[in-house]
Amino acid sequence: GDVYKRQELIKEKYRDVLFHGSKKGLSEISISDSRENCDFGKGFYLGETYNQALSFVCEKEKSCVYSFRYSLLDLKIKKFECDLEWMLAICYYRGTLGEYVSNSMVREIVNEIEKADIVIAPIADNKMFYIMAQFTEGEINADVALHSLSASKLGRQFIFKTEKALQNLVPIEKYYLSVPERKDCRKVLNERSYEIDTKLKLAKREFKTGLYIEEILK
């Protein structure tokens, strides 16, 4: 309730707002502090909703959420939908593509990302990444993977990958997380996990004719 109200008030006041969850708090906004093996490599990662930012840090006791105003003016943007390109990009940066890293289709996707100031893409949490990894390991086909992943509804992430992009971010506020908020967040995460498992089970039965990774990246 309160969380949602807070988010709506911020959005009403500033319109273009993004949220960033931090496990220990931010001393500065930077790209260099980012890990290499995130979804799209190094960058400053933000999401469209407060809850979504919260869901990535609610397990940690000192975690908090920040809101930012942003602009996409004069920036090079690479957008992804919930599709094969998106899945391959994330598996590339998270290091599970193995022999396919130098495949021409993969290289093309990575080049576009490296040229961009900002990447906008559906969010993938660890549960979703586990499904993607099953695809890259040849255990499930692309249709099964994408159908299961479309259940997630985590919204979009905005990855600011260059200094030029970071200049378009203006901090608004910092929010500390209450105990009930953390509890509620864990409950939602467990429900989501169950939902994705169910979807995967059904998709395996339904999409038997989809292509496997070795057929796509010949």
PLM feature segments, named:
Residues 1-4:
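Short, small-residue-biased leader/transition segments that mark boundaries at the very start
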Residues 8-16, 31-42, 48-110:
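ADP-ribosyltransferase catalytic core
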Residues 21-28:
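Short polar catalytic/cofactor-binding loops
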Residues 42-45, 119-121:
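Short cationic amphipathic helices and targeting signals
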Residues 72-218:
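Active-site and NAD+-binding cores of ADP-ribose-processing enzymes
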